[in-house]
């Protein structure tokens, strides 16, 4: 079997045209960037003849941000349709309405995911949250309680 292989292979060193670009995620933006590696073509009949090194990742930031580059802000949650809607429990626990003195507070429902590399942010329309509708005590002076579980057996 070895002699058949040797008859069809001349130990040629790979040239630049023996390599191709390989794009992660089919060349689509992922975390605000396109990622690409160079790899040897599948049908290339050559040897790289270099000491192995990790492939070099080429990262190209995307020009404009899309919805996939964003997550809901901390005061919002996703609904069944995937839209960010106000999380009134979270808003009640925060001091956002305390600072607004019971008035309406304006919040952006989306925030850019940390570490995202897209260049041009989307225009996000702020939502007005009426603080007077949030029934709660003032968050000032609230205590955090913890409960410790005790077990009456040995492990």
UniProtKB/Swiss-Prot annotation:
Protein origin, superkingdom: Eukaryota
Recall the taxonomic lineage recorded for the source organism: Eukaryota, Fungi, Dikarya, Ascomycota, Saccharomycotina
Which Gene3D superfamilies does this entry report, sorted A to Z?
A: 2.10.70.80, 3.30.60.270
Supply the name of the protein. Answer: Uncharacterized protein YCR099C
Q: Name one Pfam family in it.
A: Sortilin_C
